[in-house]
């Protein structure tokens, strides 16, 4: 069973320095049909203008993954972490008992395009933490690359939840498959380009909630970048 979340039905807004689209209810945008899916709570697609950014703000009890599609994003937090997130990097911040951070576009000429993902943790009160790893394009080209998991398998960043996040880059006509255990669920997000998901056409920004499907076949209709979540 698949339920499509069309890109043009997402919430969001344009604030000059920030253009954002919300797959699920977030801040002032609320849709009772789209409050999240399983442990997946937020997928925000953001475009941050040159020299724009989010000032220091708090989070609690959330696993936050930032995935940059183009440009670069500067991160600073109350743990003393300072880093720049580049395209293809996987960054995980465990908010746990509480963390404060800021995010900014350090470029004076180029916007940064990113996905920010929130996953509910397996329990409250985790120790706050930060992890960032690079996942080269070659490792994602034509195949799924695991970038986040509960046990840090295959060099992925570690999250406090029974969930996995895969990414693939596909050329037009290229196809990948992924199998799921009967009790698992999946969410697919088209970050760039277009694909056919088990024959269903999806475009950039579209998502799909998937249950009771043992196998997914994703075929690119154009150059595409796709995120796939395996969820309990």
Regions found by a protein language model. Name each.
Residues 1-232:
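Jelly-roll (double-stranded beta-helix
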């Amino acid at each position: 069973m698949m339920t499509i979340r069309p890109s043009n039905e997402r919430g969001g807004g344009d604030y000059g320095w920030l253009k954002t689209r919300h797959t699920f209810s977030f801040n002032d945008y609320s849709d009772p049909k789209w409050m999240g899916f399983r442990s997946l709570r937020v997928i925000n697609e953001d475009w941050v203008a040159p020299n724009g950014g989010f000032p220091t703000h708090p989070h609690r009890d959330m696993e936050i993954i930032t995935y940059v599609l183009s440009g670069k994003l500067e991160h600073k937090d109350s743990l003393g972490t300072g880093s720049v997130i580049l395209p293809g990097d996987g960054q995980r911040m465990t908010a746990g008992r509480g963390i404060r951070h800021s995010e900014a576009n350090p470029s004076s000429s180029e916007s940064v395009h990113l996905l920010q993902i929130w996953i509910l943790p397996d329990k409250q009160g985790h120790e706050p933490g930060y992890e960032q790893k690079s996942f080269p394009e070659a490792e994602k080209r034509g195949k799924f690359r695991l970038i986040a998991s509960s046990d840090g398998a295959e060099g992925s960043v570690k999250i406090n939840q029974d969930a996995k996040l895969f990414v693939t880059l596909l050329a037009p006509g290229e196809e990948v498959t992924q199998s799921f255990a009967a009790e698992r669920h999946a969410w697919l997000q088209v970050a760039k380009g277009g694909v056919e998901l088990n024959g269903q056409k999806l475009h950039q920004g579209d998502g799909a909630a998937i249950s009771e499907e043992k196998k997914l076949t994703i075929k690119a209709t154009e150059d595409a970048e796709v995120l796939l979540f395996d969820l309990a």
